Design a protein with these regions (language model features):
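Catalytic binding pocket for nucleotide-activated donors in carbohydrate/polymer assembly enzymes
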Residues: 267-269, 300-375
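Donor nucleotide-activated moiety binding/catalytic core segment of transferases
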Residues: 82-95, 256-302
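Active-site and donor-binding regions of nucleotide-sugar-utilizing enzymes
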Residues: 32-180
Length: 395
């Protein structure tokens, strides 16, 4: 995101000029652009993987705009290439089809282009235009269509991106296809899942951004890289001892936007810290990893809506819900109504959830299914296939 009113004014003025130029440049209906800005991950990684595994490169040119094209040279082949952000300008103006999951350059697609923003999750917390008082006047609607996972989220996404309702299409997130993959990702991390009784995933949302310009909680809750409840190395040492005694593993996946300067812990025998950079280095698809975990612990992160598709136990740490609500805010009036799992406000509650899972106690199956029906229109895989068909891309 371009920071500062003056810079934004220049940025969007330049975008208006480029949008005018874009109208007169011919489009290649055999070119698919996946715009990533940084790494190839999340929805874009899954969509790219689908295009490759189904050999769409035999009919289409597939271009990925990433931060460091040199990191993806092993994926290059005939009709498949990677460009940097500077090189993406030409691709945006010539591609017939564009997909992205965050921001793209401020260039409006033409009537001869299909540009789809599949964002990077189903929001519980306010995003984009909903945060105009914090983020300032900004534009997010540089697309033909924007996806939402269910009818409930159609007006929410339209408000968040300040676009028309008919631009919002109901489509499952491409990354959710990985929840139904048969591929094992644990071996890439040198983990043998069968060695453990239970494997838990803990995915806290971010409290303070990389650049420290966004802080969504109070000072008391941004210690230890925003990991809630356990704010000291000593408390994690105790937690690790508990996991070891239960012969179980805890995977803590940190949010990609989280500032990690205050991270006070590192890998332990039964606790592993995962970052986007590390998973990318190991070529691990996060959702293929998640599908084989036994339960999810999170807070306000969009991942829990997706995890509902697996019908496994979930828990929600809400120790800073009041502060988070006042700093960031939520897209629904009472977020607790949409949290189908144990509500945790203390370390004791955290341990109790682990114990319940280990002993097979699950009191929230009916509630999970109720919320899943509201937030996920599509319950299985096939999201990449449906999205490409909607865009008009076929083999």
């Amino acid at each position: 995101m371009v920071k500062g009113k003056a810079k934004r004014k220049i940025y969007f003025a330049g975008g208006s000029v480029l949008s005018a130029v874009n109208k007169i440049i011919p489009k290649n209906k055999k070119k698919i652009l996946i715009f990533c800005k940084g790494e190839l991950y999340d929805n874009s990684e899954t969509l790219f993987g689908y295009l490759m595994s189904h050999k769409f490169y035999e009919k289409y040119e597939i271009v990925c705009a990433v931060g460091k094209p040199q990191d993806y040279q092993k994926l290059v082949r005939k009709n498949v290439r990677f460009v940097n952000l500077a090189g993406s300008l030409k691709e945006i103006m010539t591609a017939g089809f564009i997909f992205y999951h965050g921001e793209i350059l401020a260039i409006m697609p033409t009537k001869d282009q299909v540009s789809i923003d599949y964002w990077h999750g189903t929001p519980l917390k306010k995003i984009n235009h909903m945060l105009e008082d914090k983020l300032g006047d900004y534009h997010y609607d540089f697309f033909t269509y924007l996806t939402a996972p269910s009818e409930m989220f159609r007006p929410i996404m339209a408000e968040a991106f300040d676009c028309k309702l008919n631009q919002v299409i109901i489509a499952g997130h491409p990354r959710n296809d990985d929840l139904f993959s048969k591929k094992d990702e644990f071996h890439k991390l040198d983990i043998v899942k069968a060695d453990y009784n239970k494997v838990f995933a803990w995915m806290p949302t971010y409290r303070i951004s990389h650049d420290k310009l966004i802080m969504d909680s109070s000072e008391d809750f941004v210690k230890n890289a925003g990991i809630p409840l356990f704010h000291t190395a000593e408390s994690f040492t105790k937690l690790n001892a508990y996991m070891e005694a239960q012969n179980s593993l805890l995977l803590i996946k940190l949010h990609p936007a989280q500032n990690l300067e205050a991270l006070a812990i590192q890998d332990m025998s039964h606790i592993k810290i995962l970052t986007n950079a590390y998973l990318d280095q190991k070529r691990v698809r996060l959702y293929r990893l998640l599908k084989d975990t036994d339960a999810l612990i999170t807070d306000y992160s969009s991942v829990y809506f997706d995890y509902l598709l697996l019908d496994k136990p979930e828990a929600f740490i809400v120790e800073d819900m009041k502060e988070y609500g006042s700093h960031r805010g939520f897209v629904v009036d009472n977020p607790l109504d949409y949290m189908p799992g144990e509500i945790i406000e203390s370390q004791e509650g955290f341990y109790k959830f682990l114990e319940n899972c280990m002993e097979g106690r699950d009191a929230y199956k009916d509630k999970r299914r109720e919320i899943n029906d509201k937030v996920n229109h599509y319950k299985g895989g096939g999201n990449c296939q449906r999205l490409l068909k909607f865009a008009g891309i076929s083999k």
